[in-house]
């Protein structure tokens, strides 16, 4: 096959898909509309720009996303290579300096001899034999309409919410303490402890705060993993104590006791000058954010360098439309990757791009596309999105509940059980890659 593969979108999924193609010797034409046309959330023209959080979540193999990242490393992932090279302290998680990370991904692809970058908006789906659509949760209206016409399915909409960022120097260090939960890993988080009285005042202000106006054409449907903090708070007076303000595993060194509630701040850049409010994705008006979030102990005089915003997320009904190799059932050769495919999260999006890129490369070379084994994190996640109930389909993060049961007697302790899943997955992946000639 001649002419190469067209990849639309240079986010995490499109960048990873492009890399998997060129590392197998397949030429790529990569379309990215930014910076000529930006989305409501993106600020730059860099590839793989992170707009919500700078965390790629847990590192340990006892966490499913940690396993997914390790599988990606073993599959030659560009996203993981750049993330590892530009990580910042985050305890047991992998967090990155978002600017250095995106710049590294951009440089690796734009400098590659097999990559042709086109900085323009695509409003119709290319008619080429091999196309990967990786336009992400903020797919332009024109392309979304085109995809709707092609699939015959209505898109589902919900809102992702972006957390605010404050400067380190504006945080009152006398009111916060540095620690990770249960003392695990580096003491990477700044913790703002609250007494019961402080929490009650904060909760009352939060639920009464004015929210930004949404577009009338968008329904308010939230993914549970990225709920706005005010939506969580509105579910009950104590709901936040089991969510972003949970105090478990933390002890205030000044009192020797666990606080009633804790707001965690996570380093957002390598220099350590910026911190984001963990779990504080929000749709409050900016003035309300300053008023309410300044009630958090230690943030009374905080300088907000970015306020939270909300934006639409668009994804297809994968159980109806997608094959397990991520090709559209109605049009062989057209792959859907990233959050558009119905996976949720940075790492999951990149992983879907990896699978789409690998399979597009195989088709380009006249080989059969592959379906990852369900025992692997890649296989378990994709198996879920293509087999879930189409009537109630929601985006999904990777988790061990998606994996086939372990053989033999059930392991009772969760860490040991999860580690057994991870060990099986990595062994199965290695054998499968060798078997398929992808090792």
UniProtKB/Swiss-Prot annotation:
UniProt-listed Pfam families: GIDA (PF01134)
GO cellular component term, pick one: cytosol
EC number annotated for this UniProt entry: 2.1.1.74
Chain positions recorded as FAD binding sites: 9-14
BP GO terms, sorted: tRNA methylation; tRNA wobble uridine modification
Subcellular location: Cytoplasm
Catalytic activity annotation: uridine(54) in tRNA + (6R)-5,10-methylene-5,6,7,8-tetrahydrofolate + NADH + H(+) = 5-methyluridine(54) in tRNA + (6S)-5,6,7,8-tetrahydrofolate + NAD(+); uridine(54) in tRNA + (6R)-5,10-methylene-5,6,7,8-tetrahydrofolate + NADPH + H(+) = 5-methyluridine(54) in tRNA + (6S)-5,6,7,8-tetrahydrofolate + NADP(+)
Single GO MF descriptor: tRNA (uracil(54)-C5)-methyltransferase activity, 5,10-methylenetetrahydrofolate-dependent
UniProt cofactor(s): FAD
InterPro entries linked to this entry: FAD/NAD-bd_sf, MnmG-rel, MnmG_N, TrmFO
Keywords for the protein's UniProt record, in alphabetical order: Cytoplasm, FAD, Flavoprotein, Methyltransferase, NAD, NADP, Transferase, tRNA processing
Known function: Catalyzes the folate-dependent formation of 5-methyl-uridine at position 54 (M-5-U54) in all tRNAs.
Family: Belongs to the MnmG family. TrmFO subfamily.
Protein name in UniProt: Methylenetetrahydrofolate--tRNA-(uracil-5-)-methyltransferase TrmFO
Species whose genome carries this gene: Desulforudis audaxviator (strain MP104C)
Gene name of this polypeptide: trmFO
């Amino acid at each position: 096959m001649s002419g190469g593969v067209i990849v639309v979108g240079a986010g995490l999924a499109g960048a990873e898909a492009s890399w998997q193609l060129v590392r197998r010797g397949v030429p790529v034409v990569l379309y990215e509309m930014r910076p000529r046309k930006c989305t409501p959330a993106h600020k730059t023209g860099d590839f793989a720009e992170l707009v919500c959080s700078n965390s790629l979540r847990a590192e340990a193999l006892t966490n499913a996303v940690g396993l997914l990242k390790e599988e990606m490393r073993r599959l030659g992932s560009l996203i993981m290579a750049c993330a590892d090279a530009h990580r910042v302290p985050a305890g047991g998680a992998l967090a990155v300096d978002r600017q250095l990370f995106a710049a590294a991904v951009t440089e690796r692809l734009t400098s590659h001899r097999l990559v042709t970058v086109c900085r323009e908006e695509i409003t119709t789906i290319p008619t080429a034999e091999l196309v990967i659509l990786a336009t992400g949760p903020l797919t332009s209206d024109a392309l979304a309409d085109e995809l709707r016409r092609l699939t015959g399915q209505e898109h589902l909409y919900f809102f992702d919410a972006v957390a605010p960022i404050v400067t380190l120097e504006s945080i009152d260090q006398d009111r916060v303490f540095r620690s990770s939960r249960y003392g695990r890993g580096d003491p990477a988080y700044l913790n703002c402890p609250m007494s019961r009285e402080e929490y009650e005042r904060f909760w009352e202000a939060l639920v009464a705060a004015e929210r930004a106006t949404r577009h009338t054409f968008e329904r308010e449907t939230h993914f549970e993993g990225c709920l706005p903090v005010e939506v969580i708070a509105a579910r009950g007076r104590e709901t936040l104590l089991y969510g972003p303000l949970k105090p478990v595993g933390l002890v205030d060194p000044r009192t020797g006791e666990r606080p009633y509630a804790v707001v965690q701040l996570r380093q957002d850049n390598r220099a350590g000058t910026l911190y984001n409010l963990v779990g504080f994705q929000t749709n409050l008006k900016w003035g309300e954010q300053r008023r309410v979030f300044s009630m958090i102990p230690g943030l009374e005089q905080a300088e907000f360098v970015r306020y939270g915003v909300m934006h639409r997320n668009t994804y297809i009904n994968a159980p109806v439309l997608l094959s397990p190799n991520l090709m559209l059932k109605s049009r062989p050769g057209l792959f859907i990757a990233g959050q558009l495919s119905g996976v949720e999260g940075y790492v999951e999006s990149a992983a879907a791009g990896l699978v789409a890129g690998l399979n597009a490369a195989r088709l380009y070379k006249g080989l059969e596309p592959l379906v990852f084994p369900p025992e692997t994190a890649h296989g378990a996640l994709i198996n879920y999105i293509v087999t879930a109930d189409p009537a109630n389909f929601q985006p999904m993060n990777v988790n061990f509940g998606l994996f086939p049961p372990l053989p033999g007697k059930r392991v009772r302790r969760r860490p040991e059980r999860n580690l057994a899943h991870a060990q099986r997955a990595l062994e199965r992946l290695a054998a499968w890659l060798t078997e398929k000639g992808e090792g």
